């Protein structure tokens, strides 16, 4: 197969590819289009999901990983006919895949924000709000406790294979949201409200026991300073509050880990109802 302009320097690579036996550029172009479409849903998720979409993971790695996953699932997907892929509906298919992947990543971000919110409230109650630094995930300032909680949640998430479960659910979502078949996406929109419910409920479960104990510590410090006025409230109460906060967090590690595990289970159930069982969600 020869291409016009063989002697031209404009398309030497294309001409060399056309000279290879058994290789049609139309087939190569179609394969690249299919690979791109298969990678869009996973790639959009990796860009918007927590940890995967953070600045700690370079964009090039996320793009390569999404194309690798797209190549892996390419043979198992049912694609529309070639005329649909090369027609105006291709734009709608691309937008559909991006919408589904970004929605799943946004849902995970909202749910993962529960530990950040819990850390901010604990830091404000214990006097550790001043101990803040740049958050590598969002780029803004956040308390150190929030960042420790977030890293702890990431460790628990990977330890229970949550990342593999979520990626598996995204793969199964092609059965309920096939390529090129535009159905109702009301479940994807309502998933944000369910994620917000998980956000505040999980944050309250994590925060309330620690904050209540710190409240009793502050009440005890108030009685002590009231009975002994010579004690300075700031020189005595502030260190005692910090020590109490550290002790409470130290002895609450197991309980916090179980709370994080329940949060991850709620996230998996929400994503499952969103992608795999939309009719039951």
List the model feature ranges, each with a label.
Residues 2-281:
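Hydrophobic alpha-helical segments and their helix-loop boundaries in membrane
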């Amino acid at each position: 197969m020869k291409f016009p302009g063989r002697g031209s320097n404009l398309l030497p690579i294309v001409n060399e590819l056309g000279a290879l036996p058994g290789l049609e550029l139309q087939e190569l172009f179609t394969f690249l289009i299919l690979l791109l479409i298969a990678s869009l849903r996973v790639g959009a998720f990796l860009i918007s999901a927590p940890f995967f979409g953070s600045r700690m993971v370079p964009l090039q790695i996320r793009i390569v990983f999404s194309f690798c996953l797209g190549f892996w699932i390419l043979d198992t997907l049912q694609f529309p006919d070639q005329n649909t892929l090369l027609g105006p509906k291709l734009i709608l298919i691309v937008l559909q895949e991006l919408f589904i992947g970004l929605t799943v990543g946004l849902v995970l971000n909202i749910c993962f924000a529960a530990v950040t919110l819990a850390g901010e409230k604990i830091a404000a109650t214990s006097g550790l709000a001043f101990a803040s630094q740049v958050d590598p995930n969002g780029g803004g300032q956040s308390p150190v406790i929030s960042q420790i909680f977030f890293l702890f949640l990431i460790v628990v998430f990977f330890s229970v294979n949550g990342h593999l479960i979520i990626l598996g659910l995204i793969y199964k979502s092609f059965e309920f949201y096939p390529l090129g078949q535009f159905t109702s996406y009301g479940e994807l929109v309502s998933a944000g409200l369910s994620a917000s419910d998980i956000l505040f409920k999980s944050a309250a479960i994590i925060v309330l026991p620690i904050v209540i104990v710190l409240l009793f510590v502050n009440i005890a410090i108030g009685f002590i300073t009231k009975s002994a006025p010579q004690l300075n409230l700031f020189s005595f109460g502030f260190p005692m509050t910090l020590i109490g906060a550290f002790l409470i967090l130290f002895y609450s590690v197991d309980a916090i880990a179980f709370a994080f595990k329940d949060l991850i289970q709620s996230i998996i159930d929400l994503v499952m109802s969103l992608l795999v069982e939309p009719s039951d969600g």
